[in-house]
């Protein structure tokens, strides 16, 4: 299926996300912060279909990561996650760059739906 980069600083949540993605046939790589995510993107030649990133993380937050990823890897789908209302508001200015924002806590069904929707939208835009 898709190759997904997950940037999430909370290890238990990161593990749940990786298991859910694997159960749906996705190949995932995980990082604990935005700095590691930038290294992973570069190390894999940007060959990811989706970046799923928390907004509030150490080293580099998800907003900064999304801006760099969108600039350096056009065509990469970006989906943000947050449990904070003020962080969700910060993401509002990024509509043109991201596929959406998942509000924590979210169910596995919500995660799977958001990932599937993001991948479909990006796939359609690559064809158009």
Regions found by a protein language model. Give the residues of each.
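Receiver (REC) domain active-site loop signature in two-component systems and cognate sites
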Residues: 57
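Conserved acidic carboxylate
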Residues: 8
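Two-component/phosphorelay signaling modules centered on CheY-like receiver
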Residues: 11-29, 118
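Acidic catalytic/metal-coordinating carboxylates
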Residues: 33-36, 61-65
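Alpha4 helix (beta4-alpha4-beta5 surface) of REC/receiver domains from two-component response regulators
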Residues: 64, 84-102, 109, 113
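Active-site beta3 strand of CheY-like receiver
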Residues: 46-52
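C-terminal output helix
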Residues: 106-118, 123, 127
């Amino acid at each position: 299926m898709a190759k997904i980069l997950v940037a999430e600083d909370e290890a238990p949540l990161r593990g749940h996300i990786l298991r859910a993605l694997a159960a749906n046939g996705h190949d995932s790589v995980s990082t604990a912060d935005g700095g590691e995510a930038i290294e992973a993107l570069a190390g894999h030649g940007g060959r990811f279909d989706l970046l799923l990133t928390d907004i509030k993380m150490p080293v580099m937050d998800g907003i900064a990561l999304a801006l760099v990823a969108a600039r350096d890897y056009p065509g990469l789908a970006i989906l943000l996650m947050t449990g904070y209302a003020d962080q969700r508001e910060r993401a509002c200015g990024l509509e043109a760059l991201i596929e959406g924002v998942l509000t924590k806590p979210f169910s596995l069904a919500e995660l799977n739906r958001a990932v599937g929707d993001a991948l479909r939208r990006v796939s359609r835009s690559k064809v158009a």
